[in-house]
Amino acid sequence: QVRPFPDVYQRSACQARETLVSILQEYPDEISDIFRPSCVAVLRCSGCCTDESLKCTPVGKHTVDMQIMRVNPRTQSSKMEVMKFTEHTACECRPRRKQGEPDGPKEKPR
């Protein structure tokens, strides 16, 4: 069965969608411990824009608290803790940064 164009177009649009992100990618300084789960599902902007010069960009964000198990591999001890993650609440197609322009601040949920 062929998926109709309006459905294809809508599903590919720039929007916040559930995305799996690695906890260590979000918290790179926490490399000495193991996390369970090792990744979490959060809403992040992704999708296609109508022009290659545009990029799907978050224009609204909020922080969500998630309970994660932290395991210390040296002592084999574990504890539950609350970690903060950034979720995107609104997305827009915005102009891409030109090469050589400085990056903005790294997205940190803390």
Swiss-Prot record:
One of its GO terms (molecular function) is vascular endothelial growth factor receptor binding. The modification Pyrrolidone carboxylic acid is found at Q1. InterPro entries: Cystine-knot_cytokine, PD_growth_factor_CS, PDGF/VEGF_dom, PDGF/VEGF_growth_factor. Transmembrane segments: none annotated. It holds the Pfam family PDGF. The keyword Cytoplasm does not apply. CDD domains: PDGF (cd00135). SMART domains: PDGF (SM00141). It is found in: Secreted. SUPFAM superfamilies: Cystine-knot cytokines (SSF57501). Expressed by the venom gland. Disulfide bonds join C14-C56, C45-C91, C49-C93. GO terms for biological process: induction of positive chemotaxis; positive regulation of angiogenesis; positive regulation of endothelial cell proliferation; positive regulation of mast cell chemotaxis; response to hypoxia; sprouting angiogenesis; vascular endothelial growth factor receptor signaling pathway; vascular endothelial growth factor signaling pathway. Keywords: Disulfide bond, Growth factor, Pyrrolidone carboxylic acid, Secreted, Toxin. GO terms for cellular component: extracellular space; membrane. Homodimer; disulfide-linked. Interacts with high affinity with KDR/VEGFR-2, and with a lower affinity with neuropilin-1 (NRP1) and neuropilin-2 (NRP2). Belongs to the PDGF/VEGF growth factor family. Snake venom VEGF subfamily. Snake venom VEGFs may contribute to venom dispersion and prey subjugation by inducing vascular permeability and hypotension. This protein increases vascular permeability and angiogenesis probably through VEGF receptor (KDR/VEGFR-2) signaling. Induces DNA synthesis in human umbilical vein endothelial cells, and promotes mouse embryonic stem cell proliferation and differentiation. It may also induce a drastic hypotensive effect after intravenous injection. The hypotension is mediated by nitric oxide (NO), which is produced by VEGF-activated endothelium NO synthase. This is Snake venom vascular endothelial growth factor toxin ICPP.
